[in-house]
Amino acid sequence: MENKNKAEYYSPDDEDRDIDNQENIIHQFGKGRKEREDDKSKPSSPHHKDYMNIDNIEGGAVNVMVKRERSPPEHNSMASSSTHKEQDDQLASAKDEMREVMEENQRLRMHLDRMMKEYRNLQNQFHDIVQKETDQKSSSTTVNTSTTHHDHESDQEADQLVSLSLGRTTSDMKKDDLSKILKKDKVHDDEGVSNNNKSLDLGLDCKFETTPTECSPVNYSPENSLDDIQANKDENEETSNKNLKTMRNNGDGDDVSQQNPTKRARVSVRVRCDAPTMNDGCQWRKYGQKIAKGNPCPRAYYRCTVAPNCPVRKQVQRCAEDMSILITTYEGTHNHTLPLSATAMASTTSAAASMLLSGSSNSSDPNPQVTATTTTTPTTTTSANINGLNFYLSDTSKHHKSPYYFPNSSISASAPNSLPTITLDLTSTSSSSPSSLSHLNRMTQNFPPRYNYNNNNSTTNLNFSSVLESNSLPISWTNNYPNQTYNKK
């Protein structure tokens, strides 16, 4: 009842009095204000508000009640909206990045497709090239097999139906070319041969009379032989001119030009060489070898690789009696331009082969017996060293012989049963006098080379200067016909 009465009579003065009492109490209890200040200094929760209520003041004791009320949810909605906005921005940026990545993937896919297409094209081209190379190798293998078989059979058969010339081919020579050759003979008669440098111009040419003449006495002296050659040269030219006119009138010029290439012959070169092959200036590739009878050294077979379809072949074999001697046998006709380093040997062998084929074509025997052995076999070869090389241009039906002279030579004869072969023996070391050199130079003037490889700036003659310093002429011409011999040691 008392409390109710107090509440009923509670006036503004009483309120002021209560406030003063509170301040006094706070001063008395220092902690009270300090705690209140601390409470004020502490951040209140955003969702609550603090209220202080003082109930009673009894005997200096103060009961302070603090009430907290939850604030309205406006601030929470603002925070959630900002969070949703950030998430939307992140989602949009992620979508943009995914779109860029997809576009990049599309570009990479197109680039990969283009690369794959180019790769397939290159692969197809590679397969085509490999297929072509395989076809070429198979065709070349077939040609090599047939060529090897042909070369093996040619060692046992006597066939004269294939041409031999290691210079430029004369199989397509026309009528004008024949007249040019005859004109060159007259030009060489008027020109002198220079002997200042120690080089040997090696050129051979032969002319034959179709009508038989009486056999003149054989004289091996250099003076008589050279005089006979010079005296008979004009007669030979007149006879050749008459024959050429006859061929033109009868239309047989092409037939004659095509008959000589159908002959078959070989040129064998004997040199002292330590290398497996002789350096003749051409490029060769080995395609086989075999052991021949009577010689323990293998015989190697080579083909010319200067041109893809060149038919020239050569055989290389050591001499059975002297292993330091290398025997190289050439066969075939070059169908390409010769390198400068190969013209010397080619012109030399071409002149020898032309002489051999010309001699066989003027023989009355359509199938003469021929020989193809070297002069090193003592059982089948006989030689007589004389002071000169004698060319016996014979008519086998009437046994007519016309001797021609070359200095420092020998005559050889060998057994038959092989192809006609002319041998160049470069292994002789016999000495020669200055007169022999002059006679040889005169003969090279009388018999010029058929193919001229010389020009004003360079010399491609066959040079034996290292041998000439020792006063020797190591050249051998051997035509192994039974009655025709061209030999020089």
Swiss-Prot record:
Tell me which UniProt keywords the record has, alphabetically.
Coiled coil, DNA-binding, Nucleus, Plant defense, Transcription, Transcription regulation
User: What induces this protein's gene, according to its Swiss-Prot or TrEMBL record?
Assistant: Induced by infection with the root-knot nematode (RKN) Meloidogyne incognita and potato aphids.
List the SMART domains.
WRKY
What domain of life? Eukaryota
Span-the-membrane segments of this chain are: none
Keyword field contains Coiled coil = yes
List, alphabetically, the PROSITE patterns matched: WRKY
Q: Name one GO cellular component term.
A: nucleus
Kindly give the SUPFAM superfamilies that the UniProt entry links to this protein.
WRKY DNA-binding domain
One annotated GO molecular function is: DNA-binding transcription factor activity
Bias class Low complexity marks the residues at 138-147, 371-381, 427-438
State the organism's lineage.
Eukaryota, Viridiplantae, Streptophyta, Embryophyta, Tracheophyta
Its name, as the record gives it, is WRKY transcription factor 72B
Q: Where is this region: Disordered?
A: 1-100, 131-159, 234-267, 356-381, 427-454
Miscellaneous field: Plants silencing WRKY72A show a reduction of the R gene Mi-1-mediated resistance as well as basal defense against root-knot nematodes (RKNs) and potato aphids.
Mark out the compositionally biased spans (Basic and acidic residues): 32-52, 83-100
Name residues in a coiled coil. 84-132
Q: Where does it localize?
A: Nucleus
- List the stretches of this chain annotated as a DNA-binding region: 273-339
What family does the entry list?
Belongs to the WRKY group II-b family.
Task: Show the Pfam families listed in the entry.
Answer: WRKY
- What InterPro entries does the record tag this protein with? WRKY_dom, WRKY_dom_sf, WRKY_plant
Describe the function of this protein: In association with WRKY72A, contributes to basal defense against root-knot nematodes (RKNs) and potato aphids, as well as Mi-1-mediated gene-for-gene resistance to these pests. Both WRKY72A and WRKY72B are not required for gene-for-gene resistance mediated by Pto, another tomato R gene.
DNA-binding among the record's keywords?
yes
